Swiss-Prot record:
Superkingdom of source: Bacteria
Similarity comment: Belongs to the universal ribosomal protein uL16 family.
GO biological process, one term: translation
Stated role: Binds 23S rRNA and is also seen to make contacts with the A and possibly P site tRNAs.
Alphabetized InterPro entries for the sequence: Ribosomal_uL16, Ribosomal_uL16_bact-type, Ribosomal_uL16_CS, Ribosomal_uL16_dom, Ribosomal_uL16_sf
SUPFAM superfamilies the UniProt entry points to: Ribosomal protein L16p/L10e
One GO term describing the cellular component: cytosolic large ribosomal subunit
Protein's recorded name: Large ribosomal subunit protein uL16
Basic residues: bias regions: 1-17
Species per Swiss-Prot/TrEMBL record: Mycolicibacterium vanbaalenii (strain DSM 7251 / JCM 13017 / BCRC 16820 / KCTC 9966 / NRRL B-24157 / PYR-1)
UniProt cross-references to HAMAP family, sorted A to Z: Ribosomal_uL16 (MF_01342)
Pfam families with a match to the protein in the record: Ribosomal_L16
UniProt keywords, alphabetically: Ribonucleoprotein, Ribosomal protein, RNA-binding, rRNA-binding, tRNA-binding
UniProt GO molecular function: rRNA binding; structural constituent of ribosome; tRNA binding
């Protein structure tokens, strides 16, 4: 699971979900990538699930890069708790994803298998996304 090793503050404000990604919008390491088409909070479990889906489909011979990191805590109060008495405890770690951001990159010799692996990963994510190649841009 991806979580920060150490954070300065345990609880943070929620990140804003507006605007488009300013960096990380092109495929720079692999040959194919998953590019976000909308805003979302992607949790560490969703990132791990998508990574496993890619690795199980390509088996061996390829390389996967994860370009996002869940560095923001989202808090939640327990069920049936009255209002007040402070902010809830951190429940999830999320990455704030903006449109245009490349989430995963994949290097694999066979294009058909690579596209199928990335499609399976997209189904694990809570966001609309598309598959891009190194030549395509947002």
């Amino acid at each position: 699971m991806l979580i920060p090793r150490k954070v300065k503050h345990r609880k943070q404000h929620h990140p804003k979900q507006r605007g488009i990604a300013s960096g990380g919008t092109s495929v720079s390491f692999g040959d194919y990538g998953i590019q976000a088409l909308g805003h979302a909070y992607v949790t560490n479990r969703q990132i791990e699930s998508a990574r496993i889906a890619i690795n199980r489909h390509i088996k061996r011979g390829g390389k996967v890069w994860i370009n996002i990191f869940p560095d923001r805590p989202l808090t939640k109060k327990p069920a049936e708790t009255r209002m007040g008495s402070g902010k809830g405890s951190p429940e999830w770690w999320v990455a704030n994803v903006k449109p245009g951001r490349v989430l995963f990159e994949l290097s694999y010799p066979d294009e058909k298998i690579a596209r199928e692996a990335l499609t399976r990963a997209i189904h694990k994510l809570p966001i609309k996304a598309r598959i891009v190649t190194r030549e395509e841009q947002f």
